[in-house]
Amino acid sequence: MMDAVSPSQDIVRALAVDYCEGIHFSRRDVFEKMCHEKFLMTAVTGSGGVQFWDKAAYLERVAGRDAFPGQPGYEILSVDVAGDEIARVHLWVDVPPRRFEDHLGFVRVGGEWQLMTKVFRTLDGPVLEG
């Protein structure tokens, strides 16, 4: 017997789609609303180090480039919701010339799901260095 998909799981999956499309189309407004004020993004570099960005730095990154041509490339690999308060999304998303593997952590604050953490690595293409 399959478990029913919870309404929160549908909402978090829709946020993951918005996230991928927001990256592709350079939609700063999507991330202004989606990201918690204490959002933190962590990249694993090719040399095994890490780079960090807070919400302001991430918004600047998104706004600082043009949208990519064509349709977004991404796949949502899994969505897990626990206790209707926390959720995790595992996905890959194309950010030409790279494909990134992302693990997104969401929290439900004041009844709204917000992106709290993003931990990612380069899956294909030139690795990030910092």
Predicted regions and their residues:
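Short, low-complexity N-terminal intrinsically disordered segments enriched in polar/charged residues
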Residues: 1-29, 33, 37-38, 49, ...
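Beta-strand-connecting loop/turn residues
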Residues: 37, 84-85, 111-112
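Short beta-strand edge/turn micro-motifs at domain boundaries
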Residues: 99-129
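Surface-exposed, charged secondary-structure patches
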Residues: 4-11, 40-47, 51-99
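Short beta-strand segments enriched in hydrophobic/aromatic residues
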Residues: 35, 93-95, 119-120
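Residue-level detector of alpha-helical recognition elements and their boundaries
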Residues: 27, 34, 45-47, 73, ...
